[in-house]
Amino acid sequence: YMVEFAGVDPRDGKPMWYDIDGNLTKVYNEERDSKFTGKQRYAPWSGGFGTSFSWKGLSVTADFAWQHGKYMINNDNYFMKNANQGTSYNQAVDMLNIWTKPGDITDIPKYGEQIQFDTHLLEDASFLRMKNLIVQYSFPKKWMQATKGIQNAKVFFVGRNLFTATKFSGYDPEPDINLVKFNYPNTRQFVFGMELTF
């Protein structure tokens, strides 16, 4: 349940909401005007898939995970896109679009207007992520015979969380939470290695 954000009035830079009856208002009243959003924290659709191929000594394996229909409240934007928080927190580059004069079309109210905990913070956190990528190359046996000691040799690369496609503007759409507030994201990881068998 949240109050529905209706944008910023281009005439005076004040935020607007829809009240419980669907009328525009500039008075935020969470108790009276909160409505069921129909959005859910848990994705009704989720899954994963993988693919692999090999050619001669080269092999590539990739694993993906996805979720669809998941929503999260991006509370980072409450602090990073809020003119009243500018002296306490770093601000997002979007703050360059803050309302400054009549006629400005923006979703960021003028300085002095408090951002509220409404639907403009609720975001689609559906995503597709490459979870793992493994690329390895095994050297030909005839090359190893020439070494007179090494039976097998291969080099490999492992990458984790290399790619994420999402509309979510926060750092990471994957955590199993309904509200993000400067949470550490899943990190990208890179591993290079060599395996020798004597």
Question: What residue spans do the PLM features occupy?
Answer:
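C-terminal beta-signal and terminal closure region of outer-membrane beta-barrel proteins
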Residues: Y1-D12, G103, I115, T164-F198
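Outer-membrane beta-barrel transmembrane strand signature
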Residues: Y1-T61, I105-A125, R129-N132, Q136-M144
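Outer-membrane beta-barrel pore domains and translocons
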Residues: S54, A65-Q67, V158-L162, T197
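Flexible loop/turn segments at secondary-structure boundaries
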Residues: T61, H68-M72, F163-T166
